[in-house]
Regions:
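Glycine-rich beta-strand-to-loop/alpha-helix junction loops that act as flexible
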Residues: 221-224
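RNA-binding accessory domains that recognize and position tRNA/RNA substrates
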Residues: 4-177, 181-215
Length: 224
């Protein structure tokens, strides 16, 4: 039940199913491909994983945000998912590394979060019908069928840019000069290369092979 102090929000699936809940995080509408995640831990990994770029992620675990925001757990500099859906968002996290609440983080990153919905029912629907386009809305559509049809016809850009915009020189020196085309590189991938003696230079996805060759790399990598 949405109280007078809370703002209503909605999740509309492309098949016309509408879920009403509480809008937290960034108070804005957003659309993307709806997917579900059944993991019990590691929500910071999920939020910052470039693999979820442009998607609305539904978490089945009932309470998210128990240990707050832990910057060390980030897989990328900033999250790139379109929206977040969970049953309950923890307001009082407890962790010695906690750097703030998850809601504050979502607000700062411009990510809308819908809570107070039956995420397992949503998951069953996505499991049975397959992933589909969806939207987190700030207002209930006047014509749900028309809004769903428009959503179903929408083309979600699978090439969402999640990497660096300019060439980023290696932060740490190394024996080997590795140049990585950044199409959404995970921080851990770079760190693992650095541990193995590599100085990792990141370049945007649209940088030409000639430009990469001009950096005289010992090796070249392409992020997933």
């Amino acid at each position: 039940r949405v109280t007078s102090m809370e703002k209503k929000g909605y999740l509309l699936l492309a098949d016309g199913q509408l879920y009403e809940g509480v809008l937290r995080g960034a108070e804005k509408a957003s659309s993307g491909e709806a997917v579900f995640l059944t993991s019990v831990v590691g929500y910071m990994d999920t939020l910052t994983d470039p693999a979820y770029a442009g998607q609305i992620v539904v978490q089945t675990f009932p309470q998210i945000g128990n240990y707050g925001v832990v910057p060390e757990a980030d897989l990328a500099v900033k999250p790139s998912l379109a929206g977040y859906v969970c049953r309950e968002l923890c307001d009082k996290p407890s962790n010695f590394r906690c750097g703030g609440t998850l809601e504050d983080y979502l607000t700062q990153q411009g990510i809308p979060c819908l809570t107070g919905v039956d995420t397992r029912a949503i998951t069953r629907r996505l499991r049975d019908k397959g992933v589909m386009n969806a939207a987190i809305l700030t207002e209930k559509p006047a014509d749900i069928a028309a809004a769903a049809a428009e959503l179903a016809a929408m083309t979600i850009d699978a090439e969402t840019e999640t990497g660096v915009e300019d060439i980023v020189p290696a932060e740490k020196p190394g024996k080997y000069n590795v140049v990585m085309w950044d199409m959404g590189a995970k921080a851990d991938t770079v760190q693992q290369l650095e541990k193995r003696g590599c100085a990792v230079t990141l370049v945007p996805a649209n940088v030409t092979a000639e430009a990469v060759a001009a950096l005289s790399p010992d090796g070249v990598a392409i992020s997933h």
